[in-house]
Amino acid sequence: MIVRDLQEILGTDREVTGEGWTSRRLLLKKDGMGFSFHETIIAAGTEHLFWYKNHLEAVYCVAGNGTIEDLATGQVHRIKNGVLYALNNHDRHVLRGGTEDMRLICAFNPPVTGRETHDSDGSYELVEE
């Protein structure tokens, strides 16, 4: 059994910060669950281009608000507490923070190792342990 307290992750290498976002990686590939599990904070008023071409991601909003734009279709969807979106087609998208920080709970498949960073097109490379 794995039990982790978010407070124990803060300030460690499992808390990764970029411009306008913070990802707290609660489960990683080495945990052997077949997916990774993160809490991600998107700062209010920020905009991020992401394209997880090597990963599938499901995201559930538990606080805050913003939008996600599907760059293939131009559709913009509102995100708020209680909304889930799943990037089931490796969807290239723009995530925009709204009037308050968004707190998102995310699952990635394949799981990330914790060493990934976004590259120039907004994706994560596949990293082996």
UniProtKB/Swiss-Prot annotation:
Q: Does the keyword Cytoplasm apply?
A: no
Q: Which pathway does the UniProt entry assign to this protein?
A: Amine and polyamine biosynthesis; ectoine biosynthesis; L-ectoine from L-aspartate 4-semialdehyde: step 3/3
Keyword annotations: Lyase
Identify which top EC class this enzyme belongs to. lyase
Q: Can you tell me where the transmembrane regions are?
A: none
**Catalytic activity reported:** (2S)-4-acetamido-2-aminobutanoate = L-ectoine + H2O
Instruction: State the signal peptide span.
Output: none
> Pfam families, alphabetically?
Ectoine_synth (PF06339)
| Gene3D superfamilies in UniProt | Jelly Rolls
A Gene Ontology molecular function term of the record: ectoine synthase activity
UniProt-listed Enzyme Commission number(s): 4.2.1.108
According to its UniProt entry, the function of this protein is described as: Catalyzes the circularization of gamma-N-acetyl-alpha,gamma-diaminobutyric acid (ADABA) to ectoine (1,4,5,6-tetrahydro-2-methyl-4-pyrimidine carboxylic acid), which is an excellent osmoprotectant.
Database matches in HAMAP family: Ectoine_synth
Q: What name goes with this protein?
A: L-ectoine synthase
In its UniProt entry, the species of origin is given as Desulfosudis oleivorans (strain DSM 6200 / JCM 39069 / Hxd3)
Give the classification, highest ranks.
Answer: Bacteria, Pseudomonadati, Thermodesulfobacteriota, Desulfobacteria, Desulfobacterales
